[in-house]
Design a protein with these regions (language model features):
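Bacterial Sec-dependent N-terminal signal peptides
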Residues: 1-27
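Small/polar-residue-enriched beta-strand and adjacent coil segments characteristic
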Residues: 30, 71-85, 90-136, 266-278, ...
Length: 429
């Protein structure tokens, strides 16, 4: 749900995710989002497995298409016989002999009740569904990488916030030391500021640890061999990035587009059409099947009996040959309700696939609606944090001036500093 929601949120903002052909990515230097997605598409095991499934469906379709072609086979045989046997004068005599046979046969399906046509159509639909599944997995992997990439960006920004807070705390401690030395403030003020400095150092350490873990998670999601030296580059944002969120597309409009374009929905629709074809394939067993057959055969022999006359092999090959052509018609009459139950089973498969498609469409609608309201709430939250940050920055400047002039307490100064840090953190989370 997290990945689907993130993708729909991007879709609501007018972004589209397109599957790209993977290309090798350099290990050196910071990685961009495109680098990460391309690398993931190339090294993700699920994508590779599904690509094999697509290839397998293509092979199966090729098999179905070639089922229209005739079967052609040949046979060769040789027999050796030894001992006494009945001869032409109705007596037994020693008659060792060798005989051989050669045959070629073929059969051609003429009418199979339309089963072959339906098998080919079902194979095409199966191939299309597998290709859509491949696009869906690529899409899921892309959104997964986007999510981890965003986590790293947030962690980087929080490190920057913690570093800025630490820099201010360090300046405050140095200022307090000078004020204690000149007798302007009590020594307890210095201790308070040093405690605040220690807290900010802890926050910075924690933020850096979180960043390291985020980079590790992204590296593992990419299936890299090691996370050592791995880093990313932040994308360039401008005012249009946030401005685009101010004009979110209506959920109904997004749903209409997604129902016609999301790979998951398209795959289930292809499977529904495939299930309908399965019903027609089952019904084909009600019709007669017509097969055309033909063949050629011949045989030769040689007797080792005394006085035996053995014609030349070439003459035997010609004179003993036989050819045949036939038509076989298989008419189904009663097969213990097997065909009827096969059709009923196929119809149940159609109903089951209709439910799967309906569930997928309902899930998509929920994801779109959830993403829409989450994006809208995030925009409102961002605006509130932006206003709070601007107000806190103005208040901090005045508080810093008052503190420098000795007209404010350390507590008020530190509180004003906290008021800057919190809106800044909320704007990234």
């Amino acid at each position: 749900m997290k990945f689907g929601t993130l993708f729909i949120a991007l879709l609501l903002a007018g972004s589209t995710a397109q599957a790209q052909i993977p290309t090798p990515t350099s290990e050196a230097g910071p990685w961009s989002l495109d680098d990460c997605i391309r690398y993931a598409h190339e090294h993700n095991i699920q994508i590779q497995q599904q690509a094999l499934q697509v290839e397998q469906r293509s092979v199966e379709l090729n098999t179905s298409r070639h089922s229209r072609l005739p079967d052609l086979g040949a046979n060769l045989g040789t027999n050796f016989s030894f001992g006494r046997s009945l001869i032409s004068n109705n007596t037994y005599a020693d008659n060792n002999q060798v005989s051989g046979s050669l045959g070629v046969s073929a059969s051609l399906p003429v009418f199979m009740g339309g089963r072959i046509n339906h098998e080919i159509a079902a194979g095409k639909l199966s191939l299309k569904a597998a290709a859509q599944d491949l696009d869906r997995i690529r899409e899921d992997v892309s959104v997964n990488i986007m999510s981890y990439y965003l986590d790293v960006l947030v962690a980087k920004e929080l490190v920057d916030v913690a570093e800025q807070a630490l820099a201010l705390s360090t300046q405050q401690v140095e200022r307090s030391r000078e004020q204690v030395r000149t007798g302007k403030v009590a020594e307890s003020v210095l201790y308070e500021n040093e405690a605040l400095l220690a807290a900010d150092e802890y926050k910075l350490t924690q933020s850096r640890n979180d960043l390291s873990l985020s980079l590790l998670a992204l590296s593992q999601a990419l299936n890299r061999t090691s996370a050592e030296g791995f880093d990313i580059v932040a994308p360039t944002f401008d005012s249009l990035t946030v401005e685009s969120m101010r004009h979110l597309r209506n959920p109904a409009e997004v749903l209409s587009y997604a129902l016609d374009n999301r790979p998951r929905i398209q795959a289930e629709r292809f499977r529904l059409e495939q299930a309908l074809r399965a019903v027609r394939m089952s019904r084909a067993a009600y019709y007669p099947q017509i097969t055309l057959t033909g063949g050629y055969g011949t045989n030769v022999y040689h007797s080792f009996a005394t006085g035996a006359v053995n014609p030349a092999f070439g003459r035997q090959f010609r004179n003993n040959s036989t050819e045949y052509v036939g038509v076989a018609i298989n008419i189904p009459i009663f097969n213990r309700m097997a065909t009827r139950n096969s059709v009923r089973t196929a119809k149940l498969g159609v109903r089951s696939q209709q439910l799967v498609l309906t569930e997928a469409e309902q899930t998509l609608q929920k994801e779109i609606e959830t993403a829409y309201y989450q994006a809208d709430a995030a925009l409102l939250k961002y605006r509130s944090a932006e206003k709070a940050l601007n107000s806190a920055q103005v208040a901090f400047r005045y508080e810093a001036e008052k503190y420098a002039a000795g007209r404010s307490t350390t507590f008020d100064y530190n509180l004003s500093l906290i008021h800057i840090s919190e809106p800044t953190r909320r704007s990234y989370i």
